Amino acid sequence: MESDAKNYQIMDSWEEEPRDKSTNISSALNIIEFILSTDPQEDLSENDTINTRTQQLSATICQPEIKPTETSEKVSGSTDKNRQSGSSHECTTEAKDRNIDQETVQGGSGRRSSSDSRAETVVSGGISGSITDSKNGTQNTENIDLNEIRKMDKDSIERKMRQSADVPSEISGSDVIFTTEQSRNSDHGRSLEPISTPDTRSMSVVTAATPDDEEEILMKNSRMKKSSSTHQEDDKRIKKGGGGKGKDWFKKSRDTDNQTSTSDHKPTSKGQKKISKTTTTNTDTKGQTETQTESSETQSPSWNPIIDNNTDRTEQTSTTPPTTTPRSTRTKESIRTNSESKPKTQKTIGKERKDTEESNRFTERAITLLQNLGVIQSTSKLDLYQDKRVVCVANVLNNVDTASKIDFLAGLVIGVSMDNDTKLIQIQNEMLNLKADLKRMDESHRRLIENQREQLSLITSLISNLKIMTERGGKKDQNESNERVSMIKTKLKEEKIKKTRFDPLMEAQGIDKNIPDLYRHAGNTLENDVQVKSEILSSYNESNATRLIPRKVSSTMRSLVAVINNSNLPQSTKQSYINELKHCKSDEEVSELMDMFNEDVNNC
């Protein structure tokens, strides 16, 4: 704990001191002496904890596999060996005379959240500086993020002078050391520090970055942001159909971008290539020298300082070569305003990102729905159609902006509604035409029926005339009479003489015609017979059936059947009597049957 407190005091004193080259070197030497005075075992344990912490922090970020690196050992009197690493992760050096392993990790995976972050901080795309100790020949490397620098420096006047990753560092009395082609393909500052051979010409003299360098970096980022925003707005206007104005504005923006790009590519070859951040030479008592250079990538990503630390890796879509622009004279207050405006722009970018994701989901669902319904075969064939509705659908599916999608959808709905109205009018006109045709058909059918009736009547009249002509033909011998003769002669029915049969009512009426000889007693006459004058159903003795003895069955059959039918007996008994009457063969059987009939009538 005491060592940590001393370490914090030394670091705080080093940050609060005025920034000169001499003060930087002296304060750095003090820190190195303090670190070397501590126990190496504690440093190793601390390094282990730091390594474990960095692994925990970087667990969610997808990193390429770290290839095993080799360690170089240097013995006194041995020749210098040049080694350049082709991968993004480089090896560390190991001093044979001292059993102290110093591991410096650089990259996005090595983010430290411990209390020793003031002494050693490693951030991707940050500012790196090296501190050397000429006595013991050890070296500590410090990589600090720009965002953390702004948090630590509360006062702009007392801001810390650090070296920028995008500005070349010049070493007095020596040439600039450039990186190799392999280091250009590195993963943007997330690799381990490479090892290079000691350069006798390079000295441990480092030029610190000035506020102008920081302003220059901010200007570069803001300019890149503006150019990207202008391209996005231009795309939106073109998709919405802005017309000639959008095209003129797009040409102007392209001209301005070309001018800025030409001005950016003017610097010398020193600015075009990425130089090594720090080169230090250390000599120990035995005469062994060790140099450790931190080579950064040649292509720096067009990183946006507004993006958070969690999403900066996935959203770096374009890379631009590092360029050096003429130093501007912006004030430090403008830098503060830029830093204050970060959260607002960050929120707007987050909303735009959500809108784009939702629009992409919408387009995917719409495309799948249209393909399933069979409206379209593929999205590539939408551009081949010339129909207004299909063009609107293609604009909706291909456009990213939700506002323009809504506009095209509104146009599509209006076009569909107008088409439906026209189709409805056509259908109504067709229905009216069909009704008119039906009326015409009904009228023609009615006329046809009338004609058929007229023809039928004409045919019947012709047939009748033909019949008259045939009947009258061939009868020339007939004498003509003055009497009127009908044109149509009909066959007359012959009059048949009807034979009146005997009816018992004839006796009551006094009709003497057709009186049958059916008297029971031969001596009785009609005048003296009382039974004949009485009613038929008055009594048994007065019944006509009792005294009727038919001479012939056929002559009396109907009269007896009529008597039975006029009785009050039920129909079944009547029918049975009639059937029995037909089977009678003699007058005795008839008389017995009629006696039974009279008994039944009296009992009723």
Curated annotation (Swiss-Prot):
Give the GO biological process terms: DNA-templated transcription; viral genome replication
Q: What does the similarity note say? A: Belongs to the respirovirus P protein family.
Annotated coiled-coil positions are 424-451
Record's compositionally biased regions (Polar residues): 47-61, 74-90, 129-144, 197-207
Q: Which controlled-vocabulary keywords does the entry list?
A: Coiled coil, Phosphoprotein, Viral RNA replication
Q: Which organism is it from?
A: Human parainfluenza 3 virus (strain Wash/47885/57) (HPIV-3)
Region annotation Disordered: where it falls in the sequence = 1-22, 39-360
Bias (Low complexity): 277-300, 317-328
Region spans: Multimerization = 400-470
Function per UniProt: Essential cofactor of the RNA polymerase L that plays a central role in the transcription and replication by forming the polymerase complex with RNA polymerase L and recruiting L to the genomic N-RNA template for RNA synthesis. Also plays a central role in the encapsidation of nascent RNA chains by forming the encapsidation complex with the nucleocapsid protein N (N-P complex). Acts as a chaperone for newly synthesized free N protein, so-called N0, allowing encapsidation of nascent RNA chains during replication.
Q: Looking at the record, which segments are called N0 binding?
A: 22-42
Q: What is known of its domains?
A: The N-terminus consists of a long intrinsically disordered tail. The central part contains the coiled-coil multimerization domain (PMD). Forms a four-stranded coiled coil structure. The C-terminus constitutes the alpha-helical domain that binds to the nucleocapsid (N-RNA complex).
Please tell me whether the keyword Phosphoprotein is annotated for this protein: yes
Name the chain's protein.
Phosphoprotein
Any one GO MF term held by the record is: RNA-directed RNA polymerase activity
Q: How does it assemble?
A: Homotetramer. Interacts (via multimerization domain) with polymerase L; this interaction forms the polymerase L-P complex. Interacts (via N-terminus) with N0; this interaction allows P to chaperon N0 to avoid N polymerization before encapsidation. Interacts (via C-terminus) with N-RNA template; this interaction positions the polymerase on the template. Interacts with host PI4KB; this interaction allows P to recruit PI4KB to the viral factories to generate PI4P to facilitate viral replication.
- Ranges for the region named L protein binding are 450-483
Start and end residues of each stretch annotated as Interaction with the nucleocapsid (N-RNA) = 585-604
Is Cell cycle one of the keywords? no
What segments bear the compositional bias annotation Basic and acidic residues?
91-101, 147-163, 245-267, 330-360
